[in-house]
């Protein structure tokens, strides 16, 4: 009887130790998560997450912003910025992460020991990180952020749309075990899209002055999908680059000037239309020229909500008669 009693006590102690010991991360018990993506060349591929990533390398400001919005900022161990002026703000958000303003080479990325790499397409070129397929083959999940390139020629890549931004947010929510947070962000986007304001039909131009060239953002990019959703039309051309003469004939009611960088770069971009050659343009003559950051209309991720609000506000301002 004594032996039975002591055996019983020993079993109770064992169960108690198990119950009081460190609890396993529930994320390790989940089934593999698979999301659709594509490689550097536009070929479809699946990215599998066997567990919630704990050491994430993010290449691109909007990717960082999206993961922070999902509540997964603490999983970011390093970030490479597309917009260097955000470094101070993002470093404050991610005090334990390494922040880079120049692309990483393959060896430097390997040294960071990431278990997941999220990045704009250009970072997966052979002279930088290498294609996502090579990382996946090594057992490291790698994902090209939706609609992050190539711009402006899509080639075989999926269209850059509102839906593609929502898909990116949803996929990151799945991968990081933050489905509810992703759904909350998407719900806010949907609510903004369903808002009742009546926007007058009008023609709109998105244009960037870059290194002596004039680039038009066409219908196959995110800005085109947003403008269509709001019942307006986007001025578009067969080629992304147009001549000064073609711009001088533009009859758009609103012109969005695309710029990279901060306040100084914004003012330089706006000054391009101060040229007397453009003073007759309807948008210029009526003061309907608006700055918009490149990052607001190319792969904005969770910042899509702010982009929608800003563009809608501009479309509602001083409607054409």
Model-derived regions, located:
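Alpha-helical, coiled-coil/dimerization segments enriched in small aliphatic residues
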Residues: 82-89, 95, 215-241
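Bacterial N-terminal signal peptides
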Residues: 7-16
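Structured C-terminal subdomain patch of bacterial secreted/periplasmic proteins
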Residues: 35, 159-169, 174, 183, ...
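Short helix-initiation/N-cap motifs at beta->coil->alpha
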Residues: 38-43, 95-107, 238-245
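Bacterial Sec-exported substrate-binding components of ABC uptake systems
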Residues: 3-4, 18-65, 174-207, 259, ...
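Second-shell loop/turn segments in exported
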Residues: 53, 118-122, 152-159, 170-180, ...
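A short, structured surface patch at a secondary-structure boundary
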Residues: 55-112, 116, 120-124
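Extracytoplasmic ligand-binding site segments that recognize negatively charged/polar headgroups
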Residues: 124-130, 140-171, 202-222, 266
């Amino acid at each position: 009887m004594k032996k039975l009693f002591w055996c019983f006590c020993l079993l109770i102690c064992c169960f108690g130790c198990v119950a009081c010991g460190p609890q396993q991360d529930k994320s390790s018990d989940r089934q593999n998560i698979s999301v659709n993506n594509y490689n550097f060349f536009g070929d479809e591929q699946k990215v599998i997450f066997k567990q919630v990533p704990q050491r994430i390398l993010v290449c691109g400001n909007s990717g960082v912003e999206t993961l922070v919005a999902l509540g997964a900022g603490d999983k970011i161990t390093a970030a490479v910025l597309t917009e260097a002026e955000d470094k101070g703000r993002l470093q404050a958000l991610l005090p334990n992460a390494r922040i880079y303003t120049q692309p990483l080479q393959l060896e430097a990325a390997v040294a960071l020991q990431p278990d997941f790499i999220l990045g704009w397409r250009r970072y997966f070129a052979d002279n930088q990180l290498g294609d996502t397929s090579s990382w996946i083959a090594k057992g490291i999940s790698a994902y090209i952020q939706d609609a992050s390139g190539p711009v402006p020629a899509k080639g075989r890549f999926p269209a850059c749309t509102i839906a593609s931004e929502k898909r990116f947010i949803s996929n990151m929510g799945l991968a990081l075990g933050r489905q509810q947070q992703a759904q909350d962000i998407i719900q806010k986007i949907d609510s903004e899209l369903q808002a009742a304001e009546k926007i007058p039909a009008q023609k709109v131009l998105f244009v960037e002055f870059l290194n002596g060239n004039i680039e038009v953002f066409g219908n196959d990019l995110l800005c085109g999908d947003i403008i269509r959703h709001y019942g307006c039309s986007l001025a578009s051309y067969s080629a992304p680059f147009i001549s000064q003469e073609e711009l001088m004939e533009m009859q758009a009611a609103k012109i969005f000037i695309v710029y990279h960088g901060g306040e100084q770069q914004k003012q330089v971009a706006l000054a391009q239309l101060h040229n007397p050659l453009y003073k007759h343009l309807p948008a210029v003559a009526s003061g309907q020229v608006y700055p918009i950051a490149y990052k607001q209309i190319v792969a904005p991720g969770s910042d899509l909500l702010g982009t929608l609000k800003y563009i809608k506000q501009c479309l509602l301002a001083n409607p054409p008669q």
